[in-house]
Amino acid sequence: MIEILRLGHRILRDKRTSTHVALTARAFGASKIYYSGQKDKDMENSVNKVTERFGGPFEVEYVKNYINLIKQKKKEGFTAVHLTMYGESFLDCKNKLDKDIFIIVGGEKVEGVIYDLADFNLAVGNQPISEVSGLGIFLFEINGFGSFKNSKIKVIPQKKGKLLKEF
């Protein structure tokens, strides 16, 4: 099982970014995203609508105390992975990861305690990179694409144009 924590969501600044973090997590097989910062029902509804149409399972949940959540997930047996440009190469460590992974991605400046709580601080390239692209690359490497049996809509790949099939 893979779950995500998006730190420090800010409604005005991060609406699209947090939505894209959630959609990337869903597309690459995560089952849930938690987010901290400002509670944002519009962002939650946007992600839930995509999940309803294109399939799941995938959940969105707001958390006030993300430190307690990280500790709880570790007690439940998850490996806490903090994606940061300052970490070790994720390619060198990906085979050390357990089946249940709790991935932490930043928003605003990440507190030092996150680096201490994480079982792994991993980098995608040791360069400044968006949380969306870093998460996507990481999840693709460890999990590949997700598949969704309960979708109402499926994208039919096309050489040109767009085609959706409704069920």
Regions found by a protein language model. Name each.
Residues 94, 152, 166:
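Phosphate-binding and hydrolysis-coupling loops of NTP-dependent motor/remodeling domains
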Residues 87-124:
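Long, charge-patterned amphipathic alpha-helical coiled-coil/hairpin "stalk" segments used as oligomerization
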